[in-house]
Curated annotation (Swiss-Prot):
Transmembrane segments: none annotated. Keywords: Ribonucleoprotein, Ribosomal protein. GO terms for biological process: translation. InterPro entries: Ribosomal_bL36, Ribosomal_bL36_sp. It comes from Clavibacter sepedonicus. One of its GO terms (cellular component) is ribosome. Belongs to the bacterial ribosomal protein bL36 family. It holds the Pfam family Ribosomal_L36. It comes from the Bacteria. GO terms for molecular function: structural constituent of ribosome. SUPFAM superfamilies: Ribosomal protein L36 (SSF57840). This is Large ribosomal subunit protein bL36A.
Amino acid sequence: MKVNPSVKRICEKCKVIRRNGRVRVICENPRHKQVQG
């Protein structure tokens, strides 16, 4: 899980979602998980 000031999709399967007021990227590839913070 990366914590970045700006989250971007890395591949086609990445999805940007909002959860509990935080922007997240979820993906099949665990290396692509990100949260904005």
